[in-house]
């Protein structure tokens, strides 16, 4: 099972960080998961190095229960490998 970490930056912003396979569908699947919940990221950063895609997504204004649920769902995306 893969894992995603949700790091609180402050009381209203959550940062999700994960490593994934360098596949064209990984980032769109992560963003689609947010869009289906009506969430718009404040910041998205992705960098491919060799065979790993490092992704950081920040979202503002999430309740803690929602933040935890989104993190679990991101970890279930095919191609997501691990927390960094």
Which residues does each PLM region occupy?
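A conserved regulatory-domain signal marking ACT and ACT-like small-molecule sensing domains
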Residues: 1-84
